[in-house]
Amino acid sequence: MLVKPSIISGLVRLTSHSPSSSSSVLRRQEFLVRTLCGSPIIRAMSSTSEADAESVLRTVTPSLDLKRHKGQAGKIAVIGGCREYTGAPYFAAISALKIGADLSHVFCTKDAAPVIKSYSPELIVHPVLEESYSISQLSEEDKREVQDKVLGEVGKWMERFDCLVIGPGLGRDPFLLECVSIIMLLAKKSNVPFVIDGDGLFLVTNSIDLVHSYPLAVLTPNVNEYKRLVQKVLNCEVDEQNAEDQLRSLAKQIGGVTILRKGKSDLISNGETVKSVSIYGSPRRCGGQGDILSGGVAVFLSWAQQLKSDPESPSENPAILGCIAASGLLRKAASLAFTKHKRSTLTSDIIECLGESLEDICPAS
């Protein structure tokens, strides 16, 4: 259907000057504009695929209602955390809470658990994962028993979760990675979405079948992780001149998973469409921001999933919406934190700005 530019302009004016409209009507108007502006005809009129991150945030963020009960705003679980790395799983899990999830779990190794528990009493920490050194003296049969126990501990919680974050602080221990690969299969069997980051991407890059053709999988690679994915899957080098087309090809080759390529502009694709998010941002590149992003994607993806039961909800892929929303919010929070702290900005400063940033875009009252 040909959509006249005058119609688009009218809709934009309507959404910009309707303060008395109900929030539900306004959200439908905003989504209609986004949908039309993303149509093939309108895309041909524009050279950009920039997503309206703030509008997506307002669309997917649920309103606060006294009738809601604990858990309805999201139950997130982070699979990660070992002897060497305890900060990353904490950043991902606490970010999920700061954005608005009701419950946030961390499944980590026994060595990491006391440390992560000490960071915050808000997190539910499960010290159930095992590393090779702790079972090195066991027979193969006993090792399998340990693995079965680990999988049983995680599996009994699986269907309670709205989304998993797999990889922050995971490390590359062979036994641990083997257990996590089976956890991913359990999640797929239960249709639980998951976000893969950090060392989870190392695992997936070497075992693409773990995520292939699973539409509820999201990969969030940084520049080096993306390079390894491209080399492994497409058997070529990263092509910055055709970045969008290459990202689309990569996501399509992995069976339509959603990939959020982090960078100066975040690029997002599920093999069909490509969206970019470049608003806000910060020149401070302290470690841990990717963990905030993965926790945020998990929350917004779960919220977008909840919208699917609403006949007036957006029809776009929940994973795409989750990535756009999380990217936009992180960029705004990072910008705000940098304004306050400049060169001394840390990941913890950005986390403290998440609530303020979301409130500015999508007021709770």
Curated annotation (Swiss-Prot):
Assigned GO CC terms: chloroplast; cytosol; mitochondrion
Reactions performed catalytically: (6S)-NADHX + ATP = ADP + phosphate + NADH + H(+); (6S)-NADPHX + ATP = ADP + phosphate + NADPH + H(+)
Gene3D superfamilies, sorted: 3.40.1190.20
EC number of the protein: 4.2.1.93
Residues binding ATP, per UniProt: 262-266, 281-290
Biological processes per GO annotation: NADH metabolic process; NADP metabolic process
Record protein name field: ATP-dependent (S)-NAD(P)H-hydrate dehydratase
Organism of this sequence: Arabidopsis thaliana (Mouse-ear cress)
